[in-house]
A protein has these predicted regions:
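Intrinsically disordered, low-complexity
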Residues: 1-44, 119-148
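Secreted/periplasmic proteins that engage bacterial cell-wall peptidoglycan
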Residues: 23-93
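...with weaker cross-activation on analogous glycine-rich loops/strands in unrelated enzymes
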Residues: 33, 65, 71-148
Length: 148
């Protein structure tokens, strides 16, 4: 069962908390959204996803690494501090990673994908989830992959 396409470059949060895939999204973005949706409601585990992309649960950098790997732009998991140097500086058109020494999250097609309890609660679980609240990015390195 696939995620329905929406007729803009912005994803939406569907009932149940998963994200839609925007019509016209490039293949790496489609793969990223589908990968993020796979982790929806997975348990938050500190250090989860650091050793392998397959884990029982994920922390912030494990979840972001999993999604970037699915998009084809990351070979092995990185921790938050390493993600602050991944890719190129500045925001991307489709995927932007926000990272500092202790936390990371990403914005894909206009939705924030995060594990932190800050902002709007779409899902009360502690694991990776989508939300509309983007945040300011203050205190974070802003990174993207060329072309995305």
């Amino acid at each position: 069962m696939g995620e329905p396409a929406v007729p803009t470059n912005l994803a939406t949060i569907l009932p149940g908390g998963k994200a839609s895939v925007p019509a016209g999204a490039p293949a790496p973005v489609v793969r990223a959204i589908k990968a993020a949706n796979k982790l929806h409601r997975k348990t938050y585990i500190g250090g989860g996803g650091h050793r392998s992309f397959k884990a029982r649960g994920y922390d912030c950098s494990g979840a972001v690494s999993y999604v970037l790997h699915a998009a084809g732009v990351l070979r092995s998991p990185l921790v938050s501090g390493q993600l602050a140097y991944w890719g190129s500086p500045g925001p991307g058109s489709w995927i932007t990673v926000y990272a500092n020494r202790t936390h990371t999250y990403m914005v894909i097609a206009g939705l924030r994908y995060d594990t932190s309890p800050r902002g709007e609660w779409i899902d009360q679980g502690r694991g990776p989830r989508w939300r509309y609240t983007l945040g300011t990015g203050a205190g974070f390195a802003v990174r993207h992959w060329q072309g995305l």
